Swiss-Prot record:
The keyword Transport does not apply. Coiled coil: none annotated. This is 5-taurinomethyluridine-[tRNA] synthase subunit GTPB3, mitochondrial. K(+) binds at N259. 5,10-methylenetetrahydrofolate binds at R52, E112, K152, K492. Keywords: GTP-binding, Hydrolase, Magnesium, Metal-binding, Mitochondrion, Nucleotide-binding, Potassium, Transit peptide, tRNA processing. Ubiquitously expressed. Highly expressed in tissues with high metabolic rates including heart, liver and brain. Weakly expressed in skeletal muscle. InterPro entries: G_TrmE (IPR031168), GTP-bd (IPR006073), GTP-bd_TrmE_N (IPR018948), GTPase_MnmE (IPR004520), MnmE_dom2 (IPR027368), MnmE_helical (IPR025867), P-loop_NTPase (IPR027417), Small_GTP-bd (IPR005225). PROSITE patterns: G_TRME (PS51709). It comes from the Eukaryota. It comes from Mus musculus (Mouse). Forms a homodimer in the presence of potassium. Its main location: mitochondrion.
Length: 492
């Protein structure tokens, strides 16, 4: 091994990658000097309300409201009487916690007041804090923005925190926690180290290519590193749609011939009367949507008009809209009447909808289909077997609820395939921004492979590394940061 190559690789590994926000010039420019305060718990009456401060005057705020000459022990709750700093009027008996920086959420001196949650108490304490010199009300997301500015959170971790606050299903919560714990940031840091190593090899060859002591195969080693990284990035980009579906919800469309029980199924899955149920065919004429938590996954569930021909103009428009919605579906629940499988409408649905979808579903990227035979409670035990060849299906009765457990288990499997399973596998890309920067990194690696000059190849690797840097928050523009932090509430 060439005597200087390992040293060069080590030096490059410690070069200003700026993957962590605390090393980023743009993050440093965000570090504020003022002290902020806000109600961090929910609005309205509650047993306990949490009011927090962050900034250099937090200690002054604590002394002003408690008359303490010295702060209490760090990170230990102490019961204190709060008084207005101007009038001395008692406000509340409160638990106070002192978090000296940099060992705090924001990296600054912080105080938390755990007060009784009545509106008058909360209002009184906020007014008292507003009278302390150097304190001002916080803006939306400002506490988290300060944590980012002080390197406590990377940008992907900030997004994970925002997703955790908005999470409505178990799958969303699991994914948000993984991102908040830094799994995506750590993955990007690993990729960046690979790029740094490859760049060190290329730059070593540029600087010492004619040195007899340079180890043979240096460029080949760089090529191997880049090819392995291209495979990893390509795999994550192919799965990017899953992460976005986990964040926004999978499109599940219920379809079938008239009177098969589609609306009953939608009402059963959503556990509320979304659709009108009637024995009259063609009752549903428009697409009805409702957000649902199915098996822990977010879903946009759509009820559609029964598919048939030769009906009035209004219903025909409903059929057209139903077919259009089918094209947008991630998962299709095809519903047939188990007691009427030989009817022309059932046979037509099998031929024109189910068979093409099954052929398409052989492709892993195609739409997914679950065929359901509803009204199984109407089947007689002594009835002759149906001679129609049916694809794999589930028996179901929306009337009695029979078969619902099997349906929910099958839906869980299909939804995990569409949205990804946040309990296993690598972290998902939940934002378009993630996909954009990873694609930019992959494009730069493509330029590296095509480069005819080593200087251009090295610049392509630097550009790839910059894209990873932007993903985790280094060198991010103010506009992008503003867009991300505006999703937070005041006090977070």
């Amino acid at each position: 091994m060439w005597r200087g190559l390992s040293a060069l690789v080590t030096q490059a590994a410690w070069a200003p990658l700026r993957l962590c926000a605390r090393c980023s010039t743009s993050a440093e420019s965000l570090v504020p000097s003022s002290t902020i305060f806000a109600l961090s718990s929910g609005q309205g009456r509650c047993a306990i309300a949490v009011i927090r401060t962050s900034g250099p005057a937090s200690g002054l705020a604590l002394r002003s409201l408690t008359a303490l000459q010295e702060p209490p022990p760090a990170r230990r709750a102490c019961l204190r009487l709060l008084r207005h700093p101007c009038s001395g009027e008692p406000l509340d008996r409160s638990l106070v916690l002192w978090f000296p920086g940099p060992q705090s959420f924001t990296g600054e001196d912080c105080v938390e007041f755990h007060v009784h949650g009545g509106p008058a108490v909360v209002s009184g304490v906020l007014q008292a804090l507003g009278s302390v010199p150097g304190l001002r009300p916080a803006e939306a997301g400002e506490f988290t923005r300060r944590a980012f500015a002080h390197g406590k959170l990377s940008l992907t971790e900030v997004e994970g925190l925002a997703d955790l606050i908005r999470a409505e299903t178990e799958a969303q919560r699991r994914q948000a926690l993984r991102q908040l714990d830094g799994e995506l940031s750590q993955l990007c840091q690993g990729w960046a180290k690979t790029l740094t190593k490859a760049l060190a090899y290329v730059e070593a060859y540029i600087d010492f290519g004619e040195d007899d002591n340079l180890e043979e195969g240096v460029l080949e080693q760089a090529d191997r590193e880049v090819r392995a990284l291209e495979v990893a990035l390509g795999s994550h980009l192919r799965d990017a749609r899953r992460g976005q579906r986990l964040l926004s919800g999978a499109n599940v469309v219920v379809t079938g011939p008239p009177n098969a029980g589609k609306s009953s199924l939608v009402n059963l899955l959503s556990q509320k009367p979304v659709s009108i149920v009637s024995p009259e065919p063609g009752t549903t004429r428009d697409v009805l949507e409702t957000p649902v938590d199915l098996a822990g996954f977010p879903v946009l569930l759509s009820d559609t008009a029964g598919l048939r021909e030769g009906v009035g103009a209004v219903e025909q428009e409903g059929v057209r809209r139903a077919r259009h919605r089918l094209e947008q579906a991630d998962i299709i629940l095809g519903v047939l009447d188990a007691s009427d499988l030989a009817s022309s409408s059932s046979c037509s649905f099998l031929d024109t909808v189910v068979t093409p979808l099954l052929a398409q579903s052989q492709d892993s990227g195609g739409q997914r289909l679950l065929l359901l035979l509803n009204k199984s409670d109407l089947l007689s035990a002594n009835a002759p077997a149906c001679d129609i060849a049916l694809p794999p299906h589930l028996l179901l009765s929306c009337h009695t609820g029979a078969g619902m457990d099997s349906l929910l288990q099958a839906l869980k499997t299909e939804l995990a395939a569409v949205c990804g399973d946040p309990s296993t596998g690598p972290p998902l890309l939940t934002r378009v921004r993630h996909q954009y920067h990873l694609q930019g990194c992959l494009d730069a690696l493509g330029h590296y492979q095509l480069a005819t000059d080593l200087a251009l190849a090295a610049e392509a690797l630097r550009q790839a590394r910059r894209q990873l840097n932007h993903l985790t928050g280094g060198g991010g523009t103010e506009e992008i940061l503003d867009l991300i932090f505006q999703d937070f509430c005041v006090g977070k």
